[in-house]
Amino acid sequence: MPDDLSGWQPPRPDAGARVWGAAASTPGHDVREARVGQRAPQPSPGPAVGAAGPGDRGRPGRWRRASGAARLGSAYVGLIVVAALVAVGGLAATPRYGEGTAWGGTTVDDLRRAPGATSWSVDLAAALAPAVPRGCLHLWPSEAVDGLVAVGSSVDLDVGSPVDGTGCRDAAAADPSSRVALVDVAAGRVVWVHDLAREVAGTDPLSIPSSQVVPSAGRVLVQTQTTGSTVLVALDLADGSVLESTRGRRDLPSVSVATSGRLQLRTSTALGDSGGRYSLVDAGDLDHPVWEGRADVGTAPLLLPDGLVVVRSERARRVDGRTGQERPFGAAPDVVAVSPTDPGTVYALGRRLGGARTVSALDRSGEAAWSAPTGSRGFAVTPRCVVTTGRLDTAATCLDRRDGSTAWTTDLGGAFSVEAVPGQVGDDVYAVVQRDGDAALAALSGDDGHVRFRTPVGQLDTVVAASRTVVYLGTDDARSFPRGVTAFDAATGAELWTYRSPGTVSFWGGALVSIDDRGVARRLVDDTAVGRTS
């Protein structure tokens, strides 16, 4: 295991904090809160108890002359005042975390300590390519859906691997299999393994497979390369058997795929073709696309969970993902986004039909519920806001998702990126800000935009997930498969821990999973508590 798995230790408090920590060990107070280095409020100087202040002349010794009942009453009042001060101080020192449901519907493990244990391990290399030297193998997990992940493999000819390219090539020739495994993330169990080479002729073990788990269609879709063309295979979610397959055209060798829910947007490009050919495919019927067509030069269709938006003849159309029917769409966007809490509304950034650049919220009919002018080139939909950029891309502006009104604007002092964070609880907006060669993670309050914290991070770090009390950043330049994850406190920005893997580490839904350089996957956990995974 890496050397950096020890639990996060807070800085040693100074003398004042140590005194407060010792006093806080009395019953009714959590001493762990005192150890974060916060200093308790110190009483202001004043006359000593029983001393005569300026307003007490002529009444010396009043405390001494009081009756026993009066002294007892004064003591009770003093205790009440002290208790109130402790309560107020405790509230001020207690971090505030978000409440409510997880953004995107995925509850992410709340790992406040470095993951020093594993709840399961699966030898994926042995399941997918037992005859291939492990140094030659690369594993490709899909996005997790309903707690399931499909994992494909390819033989890597990288000469920097422990096995040279010739040895890897020989292994691929000796074992031309192309296997896919379905993994149950909660149980850490391989549900099934299927070798595509049994039904699909000409599969290439060097090809990088792309998988999609589609529980609503009862299928796992796998695209891989064969001799001369691509092939898309539908496997049964229950047992991995082949349900159907379809081959791409040999004259359209380049195929890229975007996925959303049970829909795929497939782009095919021929040599010398000035524009792509597009098809919208439902996972339940690969041979009969819902829609096929082209887009204006310089534009591309944009996929939605229930269809797509395409611009043809300078007119934007929304295509229904079930019927393929088209209807007018009130914007010609460069970017679209949908909130998981309101899938019926499409947020679009781009050119309105009149020519002005706007960000808009459009309903299913394609009519704009609201529209706001913007100079932004990018945006993100967060729990409370549609966040856009402005003023040379250093200011974040929150547009209220309900009506498009400006809720707040905060200048972050540098270029930044904002993304909706899977699993986050609460309305904070997380941004990675770049300035003068340095980067910082900034948390902005969803209420008014004030910066709740700002903490240094790596220039290539990206926010990959969040839980109720933790924000997780991928800490490597390989965005899809980061080699490290760093955890930060969601209320204070304090760094909690960093985990680095010799292979890859990423979130499979709400579970943090590492795949080492031997092809063994492990779910990383804090052995004191693990949150529920969706």
Task: Enumerate the language-model features and the residues they cover.
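N-terminal "mature head" segments of proteins
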Residues: P43-V213, P328, R518-S534
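Repeated scaffold domains used in trafficking and secretory/extracellular systems
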Residues: A131-A144, L196-P215, G248-R262, R294-G307, ...
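Structural motif
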Residues: D170-R179, G228-V233, G272-S279, E314-V319, ...
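Solenoidal tandem-repeat scaffolds enriched in leucines and small polar residues
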Residues: R250-G378, V386-V387
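Blade-level signature of beta-propeller repeat domains, shared across WD40, Kelch, NHL, RCC1
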Residues: G493-S534
